[in-house]
Amino acid sequence: MPAFPLLAVDIGNTTTVLGLADASGALTHTWRIRTNREMLPDDLALQLHGLFTLAGAPIPRAAVLSSVAPPVGENYALALKRHFMIDAFAVSAENLPDVTVELDTPGSVGADRLCNLFGAEKYLGGLDYAVVVDFGTSTNFDVVGRGRRFLGGILATGAQVSADALFARAAKLPRITLQAPETAIGKNTVHALQSGLVFGYAEMVDGLLRRIRAELPGEAVAVATGGFSRTVQGICQEIDYYDETLTLRGLVELWASRSEVR
């Protein structure tokens, strides 16, 4: 049986999201911090202890890690081992025997995308397919099938990365907050940029989802997660659900599933 509280850590290129789950699998605490490649294991242990203390949260007894930044994931594992006496489980395609990865090179699939597979299961209902749109440094479209099948997907440039590239190459354009304007037709530079970056990005997401659905042999539910999902909520017409904790919850469910298999 798994030990609780369980610490779930989703390490992205830009942001790291952490959560504590109780014995029912519910997330009782969540945190969102910057991914820092310069922090050593002892630094990370101090940061974790500070997060737990400030929130009045219990110390975890087990941990599961998903990382797309391998050195950072390794440092988290060392921090948990040295200071919390926890052998963290690091997610990969090789250590999930009940998952079928239908890619040319199955071992290349990112750990976060496997977590999204588990997180998407609750949304399948009577359908055989789901698409998770994960808005991060890149925007991932993860296509999964019933029976824990990872079918592939699409990788696109993240909205903030696109905006940063534009600002870097056009010195006279002001840096803006990525939020939806009231109308598509801009009356000033900031408004016009927001329209192009937010509405344009939403149209890309809708268009790619339509293409994915056209290629699948059955209906698919689409679920959005990641920080930028809040910005496009209500704008994207092809997204059915928004779930900011989908990847974390997927980590918890993956851990529980692994414990059941053992």
UniProtKB/Swiss-Prot annotation:
Against Gene3D superfamilies, the record matches this protein to: 3.30.420.40
Binding-site residues, substrate: 110-113, 189
According to its UniProt entry, the protein's GO biological process terms are: coenzyme A biosynthetic process
Q: Which domain of life is it from?
A: Bacteria
| Catalytic residues of the enzyme | 112 (proton acceptor)
Q: Where does K(+) bind?
A: 134
Q: What is its pathway?
A: Cofactor biosynthesis; coenzyme A biosynthesis; CoA from (R)-pantothenate: step 1/5
- Bound how, and how many: what does the cofactor note say? A monovalent cation. Ammonium or potassium.
Cofactor(s) needed: NH4(+); K(+)
Role summary: Catalyzes the phosphorylation of pantothenate (Pan), the first step in CoA biosynthesis.
Q: How does it assemble?
A: Homodimer.
Q: What is this protein called?
A: Type III pantothenate kinase
Q: Where does this protein come from, organism-wise?
A: Deinococcus radiodurans (strain ATCC 13939 / DSM 20539 / JCM 16871 / CCUG 27074 / LMG 4051 / NBRC 15346 / NCIMB 9279 / VKM B-1422 / R1)
